[in-house]
Regions:
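Small-residue-enriched hydrophobic alpha-helices in membranes
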Residues: 1-178
Length: 178
C-alpha cells in the first residue's frame, strides 16, 4: 500500500473525532509491516489531521472525510476488483472492528469505498461477517485468559486459536482471489 492509501485509512480512523492510542499503534504496525518508518508514519498522520482540522462538528468531519474518499476514488487508477483494493478494503473493515464497535459512519465509508472501487456488496458483507467472527473469537480468548488454567479451558482456547487461524486463512483467500 502507498502513502495515499494510508492517508485514507488514517482518515477513516479519525472519523470518530480522535484516533485512540490502540488504533494508532495498529495503524503504525501496519505501515511498518509495509516497509515504512516512523518518519513516514508521522508524515501521514500529520497530513491526515491537517485535512480534518477545519471540521466544526462530527457531521462536518464526516463530510470532509467522505469527500476525501470520493477524491481518492477519482484519483485511483487501480479501480476494480484488484488485490490492492481488496487489501485496502480489508484494512478499513479490520480497523473498523478494532475498537469492538463498527459504527454506522465507518460502515458507510467502507461501503462507499467498495462501491467506488467496483467491489461487490456481497464481497463486502462477507468480509464484514468474517471481521465480526474474528472479533468474537478474540473476545472469547480474552475471557478465557481471565480464567484459571484447566484442561477444559486450554482445550477451548486451542479450538478458538484454530478457528482464528481458519478465519485469517479465509480472509487471505478472499483478498487474493476475490
Amino acid at each position: 500500500m502507498n502513502k495515499q492509501d494510508f492517508c485514507l485509512i488514517y482518515l477513516f480512523l479519525a472519523l470518530g473525532g480522535r484516533v485512540t492510542v490502540r488504533e494508532h499503534n495498529l495503524f503504525s504496525s501496519i505501515m511498518k509491516h509495509e516497509g515504512y518508518d516512523d518518519a513516514d508514519i508521522k508524515e501521514v498522520c500529520r497530513n491526515t489531521m491537517s485535512i480534518i482540522a477545519s471540521a466544526y462538528s462530527d457531521n462536518d468531519r464526516e463530510a470532509i472525510i467522505r469527500h476525501q474518499f470520493e477524491k481518492y476514488s477519482q484519483d485511483n487508477t487501480k479501480k476494480g476488483n484488484t488485490v490492492h483494493n481488496r487489501t485496502v478494503l480489508w484494512t478499513l473493515i479490520n480497523l473498523g472492528f478494532s475498537d469492538s464497535s463498527y459504527s454506522k459512519a465507518e460502515q458507510r465509508l467502507v461501503h462507499l469505498f467498495a462501491k467506488n472501487m467496483n467491489l461487490g456488496k456481497s464481497y463486502v458483507l462477507e468480509m464484514e461477517d468474517t471481521a465480526k467472527a474474528l472479533l468474537s473469537v478474540q473476545q472469547e480468548k480474552e475471557f478465557l485468559d481471565s480464567l484459571e488454567q484447566s484442561g477444559k479451558r486450554n482445550k477451548i482456547y486451542t479450538e478458538l486459536e484454530l478457528t482464528q487461524k481458519s478465519l485469517h486463512k479465509q480472509i487471505s483467500t478472499l483478498v487474493q482471489l476475490g
